[in-house]
A protein has these predicted regions:
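Activation-segment/catalytic-loop signature of the eukaryotic protein kinase fold
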Residues: 115
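Conserved activation segment of eukaryotic-like protein kinases, specifically the C-terminal portion
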Residues: 204-220
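Activation segment signature within eukaryotic-like protein kinase domains
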Residues: 152-153
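AlphaC helix of the eukaryotic protein kinase fold
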Residues: 72-103
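Conserved short submotifs of the Hanks-type protein kinase catalytic core
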Residues: 119-133, 137
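Protein kinase catalytic-loop region centered on the HRD/HxD motif
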Residues: 158-168
């Protein structure tokens, strides 16, 4: 627990010269820490300008196997030269995720505000979605009703069709990457292992090989399986997600 406390930024920490304030940690994985926070902004109207606080989430790149913070310091440090190479490589991956998401505006996909670098690492400021993941709902309540699952699958299917039309594959569709918002709609998150393709439908961006067992398609187990654009991997993973929600 003490190690975790050293790894994340303290509650109340300010980023971007006070533009964002972090309130608390909401999640942590191998490559990043996600914080709940607020965005201090201004809303202009006919009666003038009003300062307001907008709830957001901030994803910080933190490669936990190689990174650390010294007590009392906000700067991210890396243990070794080998670690620095990997750290910089995957930092670009995080920035790529943000740039892809910033170009994708769809009612069933999380919105990104901006990406920036600070404290020797990178951050993505994004829309805060009040709700729970399908993974959490499944673990808490058991299998979902068929009509509910069908609704969510249709919504994520629409989101995937939208990104596929832009020659982007998500490549990590699973219950933990689908949030249900306060209006009861499914929202697709985490484009960290996504790939972009050019007009010839050939891969133009590469990411580390990350497979979610039980949800990854056969193509993803082949190093060349996703070099040419095809929506099949995402469709397979969406089908596996539907099966999981109805049977597990």
């Amino acid at each position: 627990m003490e190690l975790f406390k050293v790894m994340n930024l303290p509650d109340g920490h300010l980023l971007q010269n006070g533009k964002y304030r972090l309130t608390h940690v909401v999640g942590q994985g191998g490559f990043g820490i996600t914080y709940r926070g607020v965005w201090y902004t201004e809303v202009k109207g006919s009666l003038g300008t009003v300062k307001t606080e907008v709830p957001i989430c901030v994803k910080e790149y933190f490669f936990k196997d190689y990174c650390y913070r010294e007590p009392g310091s906000q700067a991210v440090k890396v243990h070794s030269e080998t670690g620095k190479v990997l750290f910089n490589k995957f930092k670009e991956k995080l920035i790529k995720e943000a740039k892809i998401l910033s170009e994708v505006h769809h009612p069933y996909i999380v919105n990104v505000l901006e990406v920036f670098e600070e404290n020797n690492t990178a951050y993505i400021a994004m829309e805060y979605i009040s709700g729970f993941s399908l993974k959490y709902m499944l673990e808490k309540n058991g299998i979902l009703p068929e009509a509910t699952v069908l609704k969510y699958v249709r919504q994520i299917g629409e989101a995937l069709q939208f990104v596929h039309d832009k020659s982007i594959l998500h490549l990590d569709i699973k219950p933990s990457n689908i949030l249900i918002d306060k209006n009861g709609n499914a929202r697709l998150i985490d484009f960290g292992v996504s790939k972009r393709y050019d007009i010839e439908q050939e891969e133009t961006s590469t990411t580390m090989l990350t497979l979610s067992k039980g949800f990854a398609s056969i193509e993803q187990y082949d190093n060349e399986g996703t070099q040419v654009f095809s929506p099949r991997p995402d469709i397979y993973s969406l089908g596996a997600t539907m099966y999981n929600l109805l049977t597990c």
